[in-house]
Amino acid sequence: MDIFRVLTRGASVKKESGPKAKAADYSVINGKDENHKEDNNESQIVKELDFFRNKRIISKVEDDREKTTENDSPNKEEKSGNDDGLIKPVITNTVEASALRKSYKGNVSGIDIPLPIGSFEDLISRFSFDRRLLNNLIENGFTEPTPIQCECIPVALNNRDVLACGPTGSGKTLAFLIPLVQQIIDDKQTAGLKGLIISPTKELANQIFIECFKLSHKIFLEKKRPLQVALLSKSLGAKLKNKVVSDKKYDIIISTPLRLIDVVKNEALDLSKVKHLIFDEADKLFDKTFVEQSDDILSACREPSLRKAMFSATIPSNVEEIAQSIMMDPVRVIIGHKEAANTNIEQKLIFCGNEEGKLIAIRQLVQEGEFKPPIIIFLESITRAKALYHELMYDRINVDVIHAERTALQRDRIIERFKTGELWCLICTDVLARGIDFKGVNLVINYDVPGSSQAYVHRIGRTGRGGRSGKAITFYTKQDSVAIKPIINVMKQSGCEVSEWMDKMAKMTRKEKESIKNGKAHKERKQITTVPKMDKAKRRRQQEMIAASKRRKNEELSKKHFSK
């Protein structure tokens, strides 16, 4: 394309007409005008910039945009407006379904399993999918379903219980949000709370709320009543208790277990009419920390037709047993291996000898250029996280630390700084190991070996999300010889290349498995510091001398006082 010709289009240049003028104009070759070519090139470039032009689903939605706008208006009667006669479902029989499942290594079991969807077009023809919800999906860049969405969405829309396990970053949040929003739309005649989502952490609950809010944008259930989604925060809990806000105002509520139980026990929120109960990170919500709280929530949801769903990146056997006991003929969906990590993550083990060697290893990563931001570093305790933060801060690394002792406001600010790129390296405990979706994390470092294979999968799952590649490095020492075995098993199941010594390593004995389960495999670690032992001893002696001097002065003062 001639850029000067484009820039001077507005100029008025008089030219002679006739055959002579055409002969003098070298842009006309073989009877074709170059200006015409330029216009074609321009239109071609515009098409290339329109990333979704080749999607059939986009063009269909654009054709119906005016109809959708009418449906969005709160002053007009809602219409389904789903003219689905021209759209044919991609998956029509069990042969096509098995071929699709084979392509993404999906394992689905249960009674009377619904066919998966091959695209979002399937939802329109099979379930009269709402056009406004489809628009919201497309506007947020979701044009094709992920494997776990292909399986779980039709199961949920058939009102079946589901136990789903998929790799980190595989789209599990939308797998339960899309059918939930659709079911709320279908049940628009009933007012009050119908959908309840439970999450183990505030950060994850907030993230789910944001995604749910995007999906439900501009969706009206009645003439002037929009679909209402709420995050059960401390302030909202107080409003519900004081009857400032009615508990029937919201259609979907997202909460952590303890906060929800507190509101329910104060009779500020009625869960008896809830029809859809979803446990995100189910393995955490049904372990010994949360199991009693989760049981209380289940007891409060007394609707006979209650649909239950459990989602996680790892599903231990005890969670499967609980699922079978509380669910009615559940469909079990496993994408990949239930104990494997995301295949987009390159996993690596580094032997550091001792605790001092870990700091040397991090500094070596910086020197060798492997320390590429954004980076998340996981440690096993708050004390160790603080200590590492001070060490790296003095190395002039753009770093901050997040843990349970920080306030909610501080944690939110740090997460926001990390997401915007203002912060390069984030040190944290397992408080951020689950569910939080950080776009583009290049590297995850396990400074301390995780307590279990499930914790390892969730930690390294902060990278390699949404189809991107990532890297995970785990430091280990001599005392981690038992604790490292589950990590090696995950690496093997994920298809990672492992060293010869890993292949030759003996399988875990029953005693070793019990020690890992009870936390005995992780022995007490030394303090993180680079101060030499002689300097430490010198400081300790100085502190003892100062303390002794103060003690002597106090004794002298007390003697003088009594002598008087």
UniProtKB/Swiss-Prot annotation:
Biological function: ATP-dependent RNA helicase involved in 40S ribosomal subunit biogenesis. Required for the processing and cleavage of 35S pre-rRNA at sites A0, A1, and A2, leading to mature 18S rRNA.
Motif DEAD box positions after renumbering to this chain: 280-283
Region (Disordered): 1-25, 62-87, 512-564
Domain Helicase ATP-binding positions: 153-333
InterPro entries: DDX52/Rok1_DEADc (IPR044764), DEAD/DEAH_box_helicase_dom (IPR011545), DEAD_box_RNA_helicase (IPR050079), Helicase_ATP-bd (IPR014001), Helicase_C-like (IPR001650), P-loop_NTPase (IPR027417), RNA-helicase_DEAD-box_CS (IPR000629), RNA_helicase_DEAD_Q_motif (IPR014014)
UniProt xrefs under PANTHER family: ATP-DEPENDENT RNA HELICASE RHLE-RELATED (PTHR47959), RNA HELICASE (PTHR47959:SF15)
UniProt source species: Saccharomyces cerevisiae (strain YJM789) (Baker's yeast)
Name of the featured protein: ATP-dependent RNA helicase ROK1
Membrane-spanning parts: none
Major subcellular site: nucleus
Quaternary state and interactors: Interacts with the U3 snoRNA and is associated with the 90S and 40S pre-ribosomes. This association requires the presence of RRP5. Also interacts with OSH3.
Reaction equations catalysed: ATP + H2O = ADP + phosphate + H(+)
GO (cellular component) term, any one: cytosol
Domain Helicase C-terminal: 344-506
Annotated localization: Nucleus, Nucleolus
Gene3D superfamilies per UniProt: P-loop containing nucleotide triphosphate hydrolases
Gene Ontology MF term list: ATP binding; ATP hydrolysis activity; RNA binding; RNA helicase activity
SUPFAM superfamilies: P-loop containing nucleoside triphosphate hydrolases (SSF52540)
Comment field on protein domains: The Q motif is unique to and characteristic of the DEAD box family of RNA helicases and controls ATP binding and hydrolysis.
Keyword list, A-Z: ATP-binding, Helicase, Hydrolase, Nucleotide-binding, Nucleus, Ribosome biogenesis, RNA-binding, rRNA processing
Segments of skewed composition (Basic and acidic residues): 13-23, 62-86, 553-564
Top EC category: hydrolase
Residues binding ATP, per UniProt: G166, P167, T168, G169, S170, G171, K172, T173
Short sequence motif named Q motif, residue ranges: 122-150
Biological process, per Gene Ontology: maturation of SSU-rRNA
Family per similarity comment: Belongs to the DEAD box helicase family. DDX52/ROK1 subfamily.
